[in-house]
Every structure is written in C-alpha cells, then in structure tokens.
C-alpha cells in the first residue's frame, strides 16, 4: 500500500465515481460541470475498511450467563412483529458499520434472509449501510456451533444440500459452514474447536456450492478442523488454529485464504473472569483459540497465504462500530506493521472478496 499524493476524488450522489491526478482534473474544468471543490488541506483519504466476518444479528453486549440463542431466535422469527423489529435492529447495526468507516461487510451467519434483503435495500438506496456480501444462515449440525440461531442444524447431507437450494433462491453471495465448535461450546479444558461436522458433509456441500458458483467459508478453531475443511473444498478458513507444515501445504494446494479474527477470543483469554463471567474452562479454551488464531495468521503471512480481517461482530464484547480494534490487535499480537494492517483490511480484503475492481484502493 502506497500513499498517492496530488489526487482528486470525484463524488456523485454520495458515491466515488473516479479518482484521478490533480493535473488531469485541472484540464477537465470540473467546476463548469457542476462539481464543488473541497480542499482537504493535506489530509489523507483511507479506502473504506472491509470487515470480512460479520454477524448482523447481535450488538456484542456481554451477558452475565450464557443464554439459549436457539430459543431466542425461534421466538423472534415466530411472528411478523418481532421479525420486523429484528430486521430494523439489523439495519441499524449495518448503519453503525458504515458510520465507523467500514464500507463493505461479509456476513457469515444471520437471521433468515435478513442479510440479502438488507443488501438489496442498501443497493437500491432504501437503507444506509455498507456493501454487503451475504451468506444468510450458515449450515451447522445438531449440537453444532450456532445451530438453530444464525445457522441451520442439518441432520443429514440431504438436509444440508436442501439448504443450499434455499440459499440459492435467496441469492446469497457465499455459503458458510460451521465445521467445529467454538470457545463456549467446549465443556472440557483443551478441546475447543471440536470437530462437529462430518468430512463427508463438508465435501458434499462444497462440491454442490462450487457447482452453483459459490465460495465456501467455514468456522474452524482446531488444527483437525482446518485440515478437514481444506481437504474437502472450503475456500476460506474463518478464525484458524495452530499451524503445521501439512496445514500450510493444504492452504496452498487449494488456493484457500485465512480470515483472522482476534477480537472474539481475546476477552476470554485476557480479561479477568470477574469481568467476562467466564468459567475456568472457558478462559482456558479461550486462550487456546486465541493463541491458535495468532499462530495461524503468522504462519499464513510467512508462507504467502492470503490473510484478511474480520472481527466476528455479534460475539460478546464486539460492537458493530469497533472493527478498528481488529486492525490494532493484528498489529499488536501478530506483529505486522500498521501499513500492512491497513492493506489487509482494505486492498487484500477486496481482492479475496472478489470486489478488487470496485473498492480496496
């Protein structure tokens, strides 16, 4: 990423339409065309940030104890009034993302078809918000991560494939799998990221999704989970785990990329339990996941595997307006420069999301 000096940005209807050198702009007599000149007086414009791992269904407010998200979502989606209220909240959260400097989000698990609906409302100018690449509901398994809340619980390969047809009808932009458990799913020390989804299901969904033209993102928080995901066709690893040579080789063999998410595990790993209300097991496993994500990011960067950033907003302690923290954590814990962190959250994110021709630089 290099700073470009002496540039002119043309904006029409609140959209950047062109960026050109000041010398060229001077030849075009833009004022005569109705443009108003705003001199930034030496300031810089940063490309819009790209948050590659978002759940629009949550505000990040920590709970004193775990709640039954499956029951809560079932209640919310059970009638028109509560659904309308929930959609209004989701719209507000997307607006928060935009006003915090995030101009593109990639949603990887949400309520029903809310995310694609909002994507289209924003594109049509009906709602303010960032560009959205939407997966809608993810695919999990009974007892799996987020099952019944922002992901369906597929009891068989057939059910998982049926959901792909629903997702296609909703015109999603990508598919999301929940392959392993998460920090709060593990009931014993040392086993966060337990494999929940059978490799056969992962492969079946990836094969069909690819045939439909979709990329597949997968929640994985253990070395075994990462390897199962990559071996069976997953395109992006969300979170990651401690890397070894086999894992790195699989990333390269399958041209996959890593979405680093330091924000969700950090509170459980580093905050005092009196603040997080976490159990000793949750704190221990939070640290395992946090260290694994850091290690995976470092290994990926060292081996030229593409890395993007997401903050897993919706998880406890992560708000819809603090994606900037993820960049700081990336710098502090992975050891990258500020410049590289900005590059990762702009240009690299745009490239991996397939929108590098319209944003990111």
Show which residues each predicted segment covers:
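Active-site gating loops and adjacent loop-to-helix segments of metal-dependent hydrolytic enzymes
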Residues: 58-86, 136, 141-147, 183-196, ...
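Divalent metal-coordination and catalytic microenvironments
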Residues: 9, 14, 42, 50-53, ...
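His/Asp/Glu-enriched, well-ordered alpha-helical/loop segment
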Residues: 211, 215, 281, 291-361
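Histidine-rich, glycine-flanked metal-binding segment
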Residues: 1-46
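Histidine/acidic-residue-rich catalytic or RNA/ligand-binding cores of hydrolases
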Residues: 61-63, 115, 185-188, 226-232, ...
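Histidine/acidic residue-rich metal-binding segments in metalloenzymes
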Residues: 117, 159-178, 183-258, 274-275, ...
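Metal-associated gating/positioning segment near the N- to mid-region
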Residues: 44-121, 145, 200, 232
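Active-site microenvironment of metallo-dependent hydrolases
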Residues: 1-7, 12, 20-22, 76-77, ...
